[in-house]
């Protein structure tokens, strides 16, 4: 990976001891199979905010599971403009989209101090042949990525600014809840500008919508801290929110 962070193997953490194992690749694996997966996982020092895990155009070699913190992925257009393609929370995999062309089509960058597990794809592929449950979990993850892409297309083509941001917040709420955090009170790892870029909205529009949501009693927001006051109302506004 050019100018990227190489994650070197350290054995200070194990899949079987990780609180996220029920959401990540080890889902449904028994202890012996989990040990086999753990043997190929590499763990290294945390990424600092703004550090790059891999860059658009780098040779595809590994997928990465977020252990703590958060990443954003983005592509750069021919005109040099960044387009954010996703935000990735603990237990979520990053890098699978490079499998087809054997190059990463996006850049992955830390939004805050972030730890990841590196999983060399060749070894993961070999192991998945031996462990059908691991192969099925990989297929589930890829299926979810396809579903998320389809939902994002619908979000950008059909919904108003209020609906887009409501859907975004409900989706984040569900993802935080699945990880054992509060569904109604959380800190956004991304900026308003990054939310706008992702949702196809101007940052001024994002700020106005947050203000309107507060005036309507849907939530409280101070900086990146968000407290949802009316989850039912927010879900209704989303008009069929995305699943976690």
Swiss-Prot record:
**SMART domains registered for this protein in UniProt:** cNMP, HTH_CRP
Gene3D superfamilies, alphabetized: Jelly Rolls, Winged helix-like DNA-binding domain superfamily/Winged helix DNA-binding domain
Q: Any idea which residues the entry calls the DNA-binding region?
A: 192-211
GO CC terms: cytosol
GO MF, one example: DNA-binding transcription factor activity
Q: Which domain of life is it from?
A: Bacteria
Per its UniProt record, what CDD domains does this chain match? CAP_ED, HTH_CRP
Q: What does this protein do?
A: Transcriptional regulator of arginine deiminase.
All copies of the HTH crp-type domain together span 159-232
The record's annotation in PROSITE patterns points to:
CNMP_BINDING_3, HTH_CRP_1, HTH_CRP_2
One Pfam short name: cNMP_binding
What is this protein called in UniProt? Transcriptional activator protein FnrA
Q: What is the lineage of its organism?
A: Bacteria, Pseudomonadati, Pseudomonadota, Gammaproteobacteria, Pseudomonadales
| Other comment | Possesses 4 cysteines which may bind a metal ion (possibly iron).
Q: Which keywords appear in this protein's UniProt record, sorted alphabetically?
A: Activator, DNA-binding, Iron, Transcription, Transcription regulation
Tell me the gene name.
fnrA
């Amino acid at each position: 990976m050019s100018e990227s962070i190489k994650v070197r193997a350290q054995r200070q953490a194990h899949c079987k001891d990780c609180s996220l194992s029920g959401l990540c690749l080890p889902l449904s694996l028994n202890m012996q199979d989990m040990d086999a997966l753990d043997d190929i996982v590499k763990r290294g020092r945390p990424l600092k905010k703004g550090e790059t895990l891999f860059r658009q155009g780098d040779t595809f070699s590994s997928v990465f599971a977020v252990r703590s913190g958060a990443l954003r992925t983005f592509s750069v257009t021919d005109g040099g403009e960044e387009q954010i393609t996703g935000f990735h929370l603990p237990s979520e995999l990053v890098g699978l989209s490079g499998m087809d062309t054997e190059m990463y089509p996006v850049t992955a960058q830390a939004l805050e101090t972030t730890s990841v597990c590196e999983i060399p794809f060749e070894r993961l592929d070999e192991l998945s042949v031996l462990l059908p449950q691991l192969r099925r979990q990989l297929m589930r993850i890829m299926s979810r990525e396809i579903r998320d892409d389809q939902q994002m297309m619908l979000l950008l083509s059909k919904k108003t600014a209020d609906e887009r941001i409501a859907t975004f917040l409900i989706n984040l709420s569900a993802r935080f809840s699945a990880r054992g955090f509060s569904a109604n009170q959380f800190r956004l790892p991304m900026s308003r500008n990054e939310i706008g870029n992702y949702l196809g909205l101007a940052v001024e529009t994002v700020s106005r919508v947050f203000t309107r949501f507060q005036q309507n009693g849907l939530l409280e927001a101070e900086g990146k801290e968000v407290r949802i006051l009316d989850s039912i109302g927010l879900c209704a506004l989303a008009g069929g929110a995305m699943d976690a």
